[in-house]
A protein has these predicted regions:
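A conserved SF2-helicase RecA2
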Residues: 393-454
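Conserved helix-turn-beta segment of the N-terminal RecA-like "Helicase ATP-binding" lobe
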Residues: 61-86, 176-179
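SF2 helicase motor core recognition
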Residues: 110-115, 164-166, 332-336, 355-359, ...
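Conserved Helicase C-terminal RecA-like lobe
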Residues: 1, 18, 30-31, 35-45, ...
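Conserved pre-motif I regulatory segment
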Residues: 1-25
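Conserved helicase ATPase motor motifs in RecA-like P-loop NTPase domains
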Residues: 28-29, 151-166, 174
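Inter-lobe coupling linker of SF2 helicases/translocases
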Residues: 103-109, 114-121, 138-152, 156, ...
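Conserved Walker A/P-loop ATP-binding site and its immediately adjacent core
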Residues: 35, 50-72, 163-168, 328-329
Length: 454
């Protein structure tokens, strides 16, 4: 695919090229990966300033997203890469290949540096999700810090931090500039910019920024940081749509295809059938989301692909509030279970109190059903990121849910709307229908016909 860079993307790529140390604070969906890869291509294959690049990312992002981006864009043709995930033998084999870019998951940073036996001779490191290194006590932080002096170029990618994430910036910039801008010690940073918030006697549980601290911190790091604030003068889109693609395993795909072709599948000994085109579309949508109802409303689990992606997107939001749109009741149950498991506070937006808490910034994650996201419901004060976990055929419901955040009174520079889409499923047809603004019923029936016909 031909890459037509937005002005801010060209600006950010040039920023990386011109700054050996750079932090790129852009919300997910604005193209941090392609911005960085464009710079890597130039440094490796044009100016020859860089020989070996190490990309550190969350597992699914390392395994799927970065390789997909390299393959996707025409102008990156010739940029070689290797993905070091999997077993130890597989990782070592990948790291011994002669390529320009080595991609590894963050959990294996310590292994790479201390246990693999492979020299750490990368002259450029890209940390995709800089917040992975926000804990200065974590082994991966301490290990990477040891080899940091030998790294000539380093790039940190993350979403724009919330005010709650300011404390985390110390460790992140300690890795980037070795303590030059925010200090070499956390105690000094904490005492300079924060005051105790929640405490019990001498025990402090949390800190809050001092008045003006946020501006002072951003000013201190501004020479090596590009953020949404830094690119205000550029022609930024008011609303950015991002498709977050997940891929089903062979077994999961087989179950999906069986339902699509035969209108029936067998799960755990029980047959689940779809009697007509509309019912089939409903079942396929459920399966794309990860679960399906049986005859007696029992829920059968198919996969966790969308839950994993949702978790990644929430992490990438870097502390900024996220609104999640779900469609089926079992979506709500499974999302709630995953958030509980990860100790992520959330609430269903189903009454005036939960809406008040969202708008006052008390909820990191809020869940909403499109049918309840009616016209006139003001949610824009609470956040600027919307994630569609499950899609709707209804153009009206889709547009009015998006309009809860993308509306007058929204103070953020950009609203980002993510669609989690299961590759090769009815999700893709729903998105096509929404984008073409086709009539709901006609698009639904046509999509099912297309599925049944091949």
């Amino acid at each position: 695919m031909k890459y037509k860079a937005h002005d801010y993307q060209t600006y950010a790529t040039n920023f990386i090229l011109e700054h050996p140390i750079s932090a790129v604070f852009l919300d997910m969906g604005l193209g941090k990966s392609i911005i960085t890869l464009s710079a890597i291509f130039d440094l490796c294959l044009d100016s020859f300033l860089v020989r070996k690049v190490l990309v550190i990312a969350p597992l699914r992002v390392a395994r799927d997203t970065w390789p997909a981006e390299i393959h996707k864009w025409d102008h990156l043709h010739g940029l070689t890469y290797s993905v070091a995930v999997g077993t130890e033998a597989e990782r070592k084999a990948a790291l011994r290949q002669r390529v320009s870019v080595y991609i590894i998951n963050r959990e294996n940073v310590q292994w790479l540096i201390e246990e693999s036996g492979i020299p750490f001779d990368y002259d450029m490191v890209v940390i995709d999700e800089l917040s992975s290194f926000k804990s200065y006590q974590a082994k991966r932080f301490r290990t990477l810090l040891k080899v940091r002096p030998g790294i000539k170029r380093i790039v940190g990618l993350t979403g724009t931090p919330s005010s709650n994430g300011l404390m985390d910036l110390w460790a992140e910039f300690r890795i980037l500039d070795m303590g030059k801008r925010l200090g070499r010690f956390i105690t000094h940073y904490r005492n300079t910019f924060f005051r105790p918030d929640k405490r019990n006697g001498q025990v402090v549980f949390s800190y809050k920024p001092l008045p003006g601290a946020e501006e002072q911190i951003y000013d201190a790091i501004s020479d090596i940081t590009i953020s949404m604030k830094a690119v205000d003068h550029l022609d930024m889109p008011e609303c950015v749509h991002n498709d977050a693609i997940v891929t089903l395993s062979e077994k999961e795909r087989k179950a999906y295809d069986s339902m699509k072709q035969d209108l029936v599948i067998s799960l755990k000994g029980e047959e689940i059938d779809a009697g007509n085109a509309a019912a089939l579309a409903n079942k396929l949508s459920q399966m794309a989301n990860g679960a399906v109802y049986g005859e007696d409303k029992r829920v059968f689990q198919i996969h966790d692909r969308k839950l994993d992606m949702l978790e990644d997107l929430i992490e990438a939001a870097n502390g900024k509030p996220v609104l999640v749109a779900y469609w089926f009741k079992h979506d709500l149950e499974r999302i709630s279970e995953r958030l509980h498991k990860r100790h992520i506070p959330f609430s269903l937006l189903d009454d005036s109190d939960s809406i008040r808490r969202w708008n006052s910034g008390e909820l990191p994650v809020a869940l909403i059903h499109p049918a309840s996201a009616g016209h006139g419901l003001n949610l824009q004060a609470g956040g600027s990121t919307l994630i569609w976990f499950g899609l709707t055929w209804s153009l009206e419901l889709y547009q009015q849910t998006n309009a809860r955040l993308w509306r007058q009174g929204q103070t953020a520079d950009t609203v980002v709307i993510h669609h989690i889409i299961a590759k090769g499923t009815i999700d893709e047809r729903i998105m096509t229908a929404l984008r073409k603004k086709e009539k709901t019923q006609t698009a639904l029936i046509d999509a099912v016909k297309a599925n049944l016909e091949g």
